[in-house]
């Protein structure tokens, strides 16, 4: 068995990798991600997943429902870490799968794939607690800077973590951003990870303090200009697992069931067949006896 296959087995068992192995894995992942464009072209069939937020046992449930890699092609829309108790295992398993099956799993960046955010919402503290050093946090946050910003499925479905930006009109404009940096506090890269749709006209400031709120008219024009039939994003809790808006021109997919171990929501994944027919698969949280019961404080902010 190769090192990478051994690491996948170790992580699936909920065990931590050695720090030296984490460094090797992260370097391998950076080499692969470095060769990917800002906007990745993905071919259907593919299964799209929203926020995971360190809920490792629920990620295992997701794979039970959706199938294992590489039998199923996956596109994850970011926010792999923070809030949940097992961000380390969650992120490293997804990275290991990416290294082992680079064409079967696509990872794009969420607003929590950020040095600043992870220092507040759990990942930083978890790394320190599990490894008694910040090296693993540093290795992982370096990988964050290499993650793509968006994906397009079959030239028809635009996938992003958060939403749109008033500073761009075309997907091609995303392709020229310098993405290899910490998530900025403003600008296009920030907006892609922080913005939200709402029942408004045009654009509005966001209560999140980053990104914007945008309405149906903005989505209609963006989709028309770019030849897109659907915007698929994550970033907001959907109690029923997914939420369609604006005459089905935008969908929020949420893949962390019983978010923060207390919200009581179901989760979903969106399966697209080769003809882009959509199947929303719902799933609930893993049995509580299998989830980590480690007590820790999770900052109370629901983004």
Swiss-Prot record:
Q: Does the keyword Cell inner membrane apply?
A: no
One Pfam family, short name please? Metallophos
**Record-linked InterPro entries:** Calcineurin-like_PHP_ApaH (IPR004843), Metallo-depent_PP-like (IPR029052), PPA2-like (IPR047129), Ser/Thr-sp_prot-phosphatase (IPR006186)
Q: Which residues bind Mn(2+) 1?
A: 51, 53, 79
The GO annotation for biological process reads: double-strand break repair via homologous recombination
Q: Where does Mn(2+) 2 bind?
A: 79, 111, 161, 235
PROSITE patterns per the UniProt record, alphabetical = SER_THR_PHOSPHATASE
Give EC number(s), comma-separated: 3.1.3.16
Q: What's the name of the protein?
A: Serine/threonine-protein phosphatase PP-X homolog 2
Q: What is the originating organism of this protein?
A: Paramecium tetraurelia
Which gene is the coding source of this polypeptide chain? Ppx2
